[in-house]
């Protein structure tokens, strides 16, 4: 499991909103943002370069961010939505969702693997099928991503959703119990097994014939 790394960024409060104000902010190197949740909404702006740097660091919906809001101090949030201009690669607007301790939220958690599956060394094909899951949990138990060790997976083995080791507060929102990772037999391995089985059958037939 990967604990949540806290990213920090300063927010300048704004009392004026609207298209003209947003354009003015962007021309000055700022990006308009909204902070929602906890019954209070705050409009603000953040430095575009600092925001892009944070976004390109690989933040997810489950990444904890600490906003230093002008006049309000530190507030822990998650990214709810990032809007970009379709014609240019620039962030247009960001909505942050304020963390309320003990109040469950729904977010997406990435699944990563570590190690080399044992079966992949003996002719098996390793497959990572599910890379992300939706989870309902309290903010205190959120992880940026879930890491599973696949070292002991042999040919024919798999890891299902129900086998994941997760915090007890997690409710994984998925239908059934699908396979997350597996090691399957390759065509070459299946062909080798068929050839071996055919050879064994031929040997058995010869042995029986010799006894007559």
UniProtKB/Swiss-Prot annotation:
Molecular-function GO term, any one: 5S rRNA binding
Cystine pairings recorded for this chain: none
One GO cellular component term: cytosolic large ribosomal subunit
Superkingdom as given in the UniProt entry: Bacteria
Alphabetically ordered keywords of this record: Ribonucleoprotein, Ribosomal protein, RNA-binding, rRNA-binding
One record GO biological process: translation
One Pfam family it belongs to: Ribosomal_L25p
Function: This is one of the proteins that binds to the 5S RNA in the ribosome where it forms part of the central protuberance.
Family to which the UniProt record says this protein belongs: Belongs to the bacterial ribosomal protein bL25 family. CTC subfamily.
Assembly and interaction partners: Part of the 50S ribosomal subunit; part of the 5S rRNA/L5/L18/L25 subcomplex. Contacts the 5S rRNA. Binds to the 5S rRNA independently of L5 and L18.
NCBIfam families xref list: bL25_bact_ctc (TIGR00731), PRK05618.3-2 (NF004136)
Protein name (database record): Large ribosomal subunit protein bL25
Gene from which this protein is expressed: rplY
């Amino acid at each position: 499991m990967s604990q949540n790394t806290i990213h920090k960024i300063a927010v300048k409060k704004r009392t004026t909103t609207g298209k003209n104000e947003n354009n003015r902010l962007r021309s000055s190197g700022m990006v308009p943002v909204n902070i929602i949740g906890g019954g209070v909404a705050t409009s603000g702006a953040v430095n575009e370069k600092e925001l892009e740097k944070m976004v390109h660091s690989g933040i997810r919906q489950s990444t904890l961010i600490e906003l230093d809001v002008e006049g309000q101090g530190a507030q822990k949030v998650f990214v709810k939505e990032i809007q970009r201009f379709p014609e240019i690669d620039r962030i247009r607007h960001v909505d942050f969702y304020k963390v309320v301790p003990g109040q469950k939220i729904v977010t997406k958690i990435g699944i990563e693997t570590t190690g080399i599956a044992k079966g992949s060394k003996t002719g098996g094909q390793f497959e990572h099928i599910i890379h992300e899951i939706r989870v309902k949990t309290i903010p205190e138990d959120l992880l940026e991503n879930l890491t599973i060790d696949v070292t002991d997976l042999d040919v024919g083995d798999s890891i299902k959703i129900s086998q994941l080791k997760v915090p007890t507060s997690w409710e994984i929102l998925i239908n059934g119990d699908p396979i997350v990772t597996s090691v399957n037999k390759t065509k070459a391995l299946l062909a080798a097994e068929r050839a071996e089985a055919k050879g064994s059958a031929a040997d058995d037939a010869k042995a029986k014939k010799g006894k007559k």
